[in-house]
Curated annotation (Swiss-Prot):
CDD domains in the record: ASKHA_NBD_AcK_PK
Compartments where found: Cytoplasm
Lineage per the UniProt record: Bacteria, Pseudomonadati, Bacteroidota, Bacteroidia, Bacteroidales
Cofactor notes: Mg(2+). Can also accept Mn(2+).
UniProt-recorded name of the protein: Acetate kinase
Annotated gene: ackA
Annotated binding of ATP, by residue: K14, H208, I209, G210, N211, G212, D283, M284, R285, G331, V332, G333, E334, N335
Length: 398
């Protein structure tokens, strides 16, 4: 059984082809710069070697077609024929309140998903383009949608509503939805397998820290709160996003700088966070190197970054009534020991004791707390694509 997983962004398509009998990735890659002159497909061959194939890719259907042709090509192919693809699983960003679990993509489902376009104007239309492309090229292959917002739909009303006129929620759906749900769900399930424990009774805080970052409070396997909101702009300080900011500061900046809503959105989403503090660079590795050299601006930026994560962990320990496991995932969470150490420093009052030696781990599953730490601190690399493929299989098996 082979499942193709697609993640279509506004100008990119990432893909992985899974052999679900062995849960192995047999082909993977991505297209970047769709609609621009220098678009290309970067793929990883089975031996780990990376290849770049340049091609003019004006829009998503051409991109999907290029990926499918590459999958069956004599030179780079992983399968003999496209008929070997049994199903396609799509990462769908914003399912609004309608979708609390993964579903077969029917005409009705796609119409309901398109109705959420206002909530994710960059991502949702791109997700739909991927679905349309598969429909055009492989019309008989079932397609499954896995929603980034779905896992957080178990949040109680008092956690997801904003304290603004209630009619704005009723009219426009203005509330907190949360994102990275597929990642939070994957690691929350995987950590139970890894530690040999049941989700029932477990108080878990999952920290997905990458260029974007979010934290989730998970009780009995269900999300009760998460740091991102109506959009991915709320919450943590991120690579280029501000995270939490006083709404009054937003209108103040708009007045002073003469910014439109598009202008302020651009400033807060693309020019803030680490990049805003570090003159445009959002790479945490650059920040770490600058801190090591003693750059005072870098040291301040890192303190701000760690502090915001730590503050959310404290808040979620309160929301959960305690915490049993703190989990790190995402590009930074999985690979950067300094980030994990900086975040956990000062959390001793919660029962957190980090083991400096164990914390040196990079990109592997590991317990990084001491044996006598009351709270287990764990690293679990995320695998959203595997979860999308697994959901796809589960729905087909029904």
């Amino acid at each position: 059984m082979k499942v193709l997983v697609l993640n279509c962004g506004s100008s990119s398509i990432k893909y992985k082809l899974f052999d679900m009998d062995s849960k192995e990735v047999i082909a993977q890659g991505g297209i970047e710069k769709i609609g621009l002159k220098d678009s290309f497909l970067k793929l990883t061959l089975p031996n780990g070697e990376k290849k770049i194939l340049e091609k003019d890719i004006p829009e998503h259907t051409v991109g999907v077609e290029f990926i499918l042709n590459t999958l069956v090509s004599p030179e780079y192919g992983a399968i003999q024929s496209l008929e070997e693809i049994n199903a396609v699983g799509h990462r769908m960003v914003h399912g609004g309140e309608r979708f609390s679990k993964s579903v077969l993509l029917t005409k009705e489902v796609l119409e309901a998903f398109a109705a959420c376009n206002d909530l994710a104007p960059l991502h949702n239309p791109a997700n739909l383009k991927g679905v349309d492309a598969i429909t055009a090229i492989l019309p008989n292959v079932p397609q499954i949608g896995v929603f980034d917002t779905a896992f957080h739909q178990t949040m109680p009303e008092h956690a997801y509503l904003y304290a603004i006129p209630y009619e704005l929620y009723k009219k426009y759906g203005v509330r907190r939805y949360g994102f990275h749900g597929t990642s939070h769900r994957y690691v929350s399930q995987r950590v139970c397998e890894y530690l040999g424990i049941k989700p029932e009774g477990l108080k878990l805080i999952t920290c997905h820290i990458g260029n974007g970052g979010s934290i989730a409070a998970i009780k009995d396997g269900k999300c009760i709160d998460t740091s991102m909101g109506l959009t991915p702009l709320e919450g943590l300080m991120m690579g280029t996003r501000s995270g939490d900011i006083d709404a009054g500061a937003v209108t103040f900046i708009m007045d002073k700088e003469g910014l439109t809503t598009t202008g302020i959105s651009n400033l807060l989403n693309k020019k803030s966070g680490v990049a805003g503090m570090m003159n445009g660079s959002s790479d945490m590795r650059d920040l770490e190197a600058a801190v090591a050299k003693g750059d005072p601006q870098a040291i301040l930026t890192e303190q701000m970054y760690f502090y915001r994560i730590k503050k959310y962990i404290g808040a979620y320990a309160a929301a959960l009534g305690g915490v049993d496991v703190i989990l790190f995932t995402g590009g930074v969470g999985e690979n950067q020991a300094t980030c994990r150490a900086g975040v956990c420093e000062g959390l001793e009052f919660l029962g957190v004791k980090l083991d400096p030696e164990k914390n040196k781990v990079r990109g592997e599953e590991a317990i990084i707390s001491t044996d006598d730490s009351r709270v287990k601190v764990v690293v679990i690399p995320t695998d959203e694509e595997l979860l999308i493929a697994s959901d796809t299989m589960a729905i087909l098996d029904k």
